[in-house]
Curated annotation (Swiss-Prot):
Keyword RNA-binding: no
Family: Belongs to the TRAFAC class TrmE-Era-EngA-EngB-Septin-like GTPase superfamily. EngB GTPase family.
GO molecular function (one): GTP binding
Positions that bind GTP: 38-45, 64-68, 82-85, 149-152, 182-185
Domain of life: Bacteria
InterPro entries: G_ENGB_dom (IPR030393), GTP-bd (IPR006073), GTP-bd_ribosome_bio_YsxC (IPR019987), P-loop_NTPase (IPR027417)
Residues engaged in binding Mg(2+): 45, 66
Protein name, UniProt field: Probable GTP-binding protein EngB
Any one biological process term the GO annotation gives: division septum assembly
SUPFAM superfamilies reported for this sequence: P-loop containing nucleoside triphosphate hydrolases (SSF52540)
Any Pfam family matching the protein: MMR_HSR1
Domain EngB-type G stretches: 30-204
Amino acid sequence: MQLKNPILGLCQQSTFMLSAAKVDQCPDDEGFEVAFAGRSNAGKSSALNTLTHASLARTSKTPGRTQLLNFFKLDDDRRLVDLPGYGYAKVPIPLKLHWQRHLEAYLGGRESLKGLILMMDIRHPMTDFDLLMLDWAVASGMPMHILLTKADKLTYGAAKNTLLKVQSEIRKGWGDAITIQLFSAPKRMGLEDAYTALAGWMELADKGAEIAE
């Protein structure tokens, strides 16, 4: 028999809840939310779809298509949130400013937000957007877990070296509280570590693992 992460079943039964263009359109601010953030084309939607075993988040050949706060229901008390992608050059500046304003309002005022998953493309980590998110997480005391996405694009040795380099840089600049891992959506690499982070933030880790046949 094999131990099963308690968050896995909830992720597999997740459903689309609603999209919000601004904070007052979000669900009631109660329960547990974990938000997924990342620069455009960092693989955010693909990672979210892989974790939920579904096609919940819209993927596109054109980065920056996620323009709303998209909420996905795990159960009556728990939600995942797909945040707008940032940084794509073809997105008009007024739209970028609109996204930034409402993202800041969501991140700064959402009581139910328990943690932030930040996606970084392993080939281009620590962008200006990533640094801003790291600064915000530390300043606000928000738990953060980083997925170095597209790890399959590098050899394992190169991916591991990048992980160690970014991990060292984060520890020097932002302390030891932020965790980081390798992740690949197509190869399904790193799922268990990501599920463990989600389970802890959603207060499922102490409920005991379910036994899978």
